[in-house]
């Protein structure tokens, strides 16, 4: 990764990329620690070059372990994407990376609310997300996004929502939620201040 290329990007594109970087930091505990410990350096080009290289290596390891997407290991790369894609299709005003961050935020609430993640882990994930997305906005009529989540290419169900959630440090799983329950979680986004 050439840092000179990064210097040509507008701030919004850097934020979009931070969405994927932070997702990787949630999946790779050591990278997450590195991001939290070096938060003031997140816009330093040499640090970003180092982080992007770390992310590329992580993704390459995951893809190498599940090249044909047959074992399910690769599903971890979908973290935040089920909800992120649904919001992106429903509202469209933000970048893909911003929606992935918001999707991770809500899916983190789901993981905690459904008993898969402890509050300490959810707090850590929210701390990582806040490095790029300081305030999760309100989304009027967010429950309308349910239909987009059902149609998402990452969702393999027609009667429920499947998503990959983070349970703890570098550990996650795919879960399935009934549509009504997922809509209740989406409603949380309607009430954000």
Residue locations for each model-derived region?
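A glycine/threonine-rich phosphate-anchoring loop and its flanking beta-alpha core
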Residues: 1-40, 166
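Short, surface-exposed linear patches
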Residues: 21-23, 29, 78, 100, ...
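Active-site segments that bind and position negatively charged phosphate/pyrophosphate groups
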Residues: 37-143
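C-terminal charged capping/lid subdomain of soluble metabolic enzymes
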Residues: 19-22, 116-193
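Intrinsically disordered or highly flexible coil/loop and linker segments, enriched in small
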Residues: 27, 31, 61-64, 68, ...
């Amino acid at each position: 990764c050439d840092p000179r290329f990064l210097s040509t990007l507008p701030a919004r594109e850097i934020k979009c990329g931070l969405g994927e970087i932070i997702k990787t930091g949630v999946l790779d505990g050591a990278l997450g620690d590195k991001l939290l410990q070096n938060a003031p350096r997140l816009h330093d080009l040499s640090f970003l070059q180092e982080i992007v290289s770390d992310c590329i290596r992580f993704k390459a390891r995951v893809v190498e372990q599940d090249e044909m997407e047959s074992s399910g290991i690769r599903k971890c790369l979908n973290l935040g994407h089920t909800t992120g894609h649904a919001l992106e299709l429903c509202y469209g005003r933000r970048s893909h990376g911003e929606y992935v961050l918001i999707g991770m935020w809500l899916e983190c609430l789901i993981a905690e609310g459904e008993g898969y993640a402890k509050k300490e882990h959810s707090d850590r994930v929210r701390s990582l997300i806040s490095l790029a997305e300081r305030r999760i906005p309100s989304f009027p009529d967010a429950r309308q996004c349910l239909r987009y989540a059902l149609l998402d290419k990452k969702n393999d169900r027609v009667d429920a929502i499947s998503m990959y959630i983070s349970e703890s440090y570098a550990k996650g799983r795919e879960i399935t939620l009934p549509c009504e329950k997922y809509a209740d979680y989406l409603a949380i986004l309607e009430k954000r201040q």
